[in-house]
Amino acid sequence: MEKTFKFTPEEFRTSVKIIQYLRTAIGSSLENHDEQKVRKYIHQAIVAGHVHRDVFGLNPILTSLQTAQIAVDEIGLHRDGVIATLLYGSVANDDDHEEIDQLFGENVARIVMGLAKIQKLYEKNPVIESENFRNLLLSFAEDMRVILIMIADRVNIMRQIRDVEQEEARHEVSEEASYLYAPLAHKLGLYGLKSELEDLSLKYLEHDAYYMIKEELNATKKSRDAYIQQFIAPIQEKLTEAGLKFHMKGRTKSIHSIWQKMKKQKCGFKGIYDLFAIRIIIDSPYNLEKQLCWQAYS
C-alpha cells in the first residue's frame, strides 16, 4: 500500500512563504474564495491518491507553487495562469475540466486542459528535439499561457535537480531543456529564462566545461568589467550629444554561449575575444523607432 502523501517541515515552510508572496503579488486579480477553492481541490486530490512525488522525489505541490512564482515574477502571469499552474498537478483525468470550469472559469479550465493535451502529445512523440515538434507544440496550444507555464515549470525543475541522485533522469530532463524549452523561450522573447535553461543544461551535461568557463569568467571579471565601462563611455557621450534618450547595458555572455563559440572555433577559453555584449535601448515614440535606432547605429 502506497504511503499517504505528506510535506516535510521544510517543504511546508517554503510553501507557506510562496503562498504569502503570491497572495501579495496577484491578490488584486483574484476573485472571492479563489484561494479556499484551490486549497480544497488540491486537498481532495491528495486524499484521493492523485498526488505523488516525481522521479526526483520532488513535492509536486511545492513544485507547482515554485513554478507559479516564476510565472508571476519572470513572465508576468496573473490569476488564471497561476491557478491553472497550481491545479494541473492534481488533475486526475479529462472529466475534471467541467469541475474546474465551474469553480474557476473557462480560462483556467482551458489552460489546465491545454497542459494535459500537451503532455499527451509529448508522450506520443519519441523524437521531440526537432524544430517541427517545437512548432507543433506552439500550434497545438490553444492558449499561449500553456507554453509559458511549461517553460516556467522546466526552469523550476532545472533549478531543483542539482543534487539529485537520479543521474539518468537529470540527463534526460537537461537535454530536453536544451533542445526544446530553451528554443521555445527564445522564440517567445524570454531571453533570461532561455539563457538560464542553456546554462543549467550545460552544467548538468558538460560539468567540467561549465565550471572551467565559470572559473575563467570569475578570474577575469574585474578587468572585463573595467573594459566594458571603458568601451561604453564614448558611446554614451555621443548618444547624449545627439539628444537621444536611452539606456545602455553591458553584460558578459552566457557560459553556454561561450562554450558554443569554443566548439565552433575549436579553441580554448582564451581564444574567445567577444565575451561581452552591449545593449542600447532607445526611448522613442513608436513612429520614430526605426529612425532613431538607425541614428544611434550610425
Predicted regions mapped to residue ranges:
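Hydrophobic or amphipathic alpha-helical targeting/insertion segments
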Residues: 86-114, 166, 190
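Active-site alpha-helical segments that house and flank conserved acidic catalytic motifs
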Residues: 77, 81-91, 149
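Short coil/turn linker and secondary-structure boundary residues
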Residues: 33, 95, 104-106, 128, ...
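Nucleic-acid processing machinery
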Residues: 1-28, 40-54, 61-65, 69-74, ...
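Short, mixed-charge amphipathic alpha-helical segments
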Residues: 25-41, 97-107
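Short secondary-structure transition/capping motifs
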Residues: 34, 56-60, 88-89, 101, ...
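Aromatic/histidine-rich interaction motifs
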Residues: 117
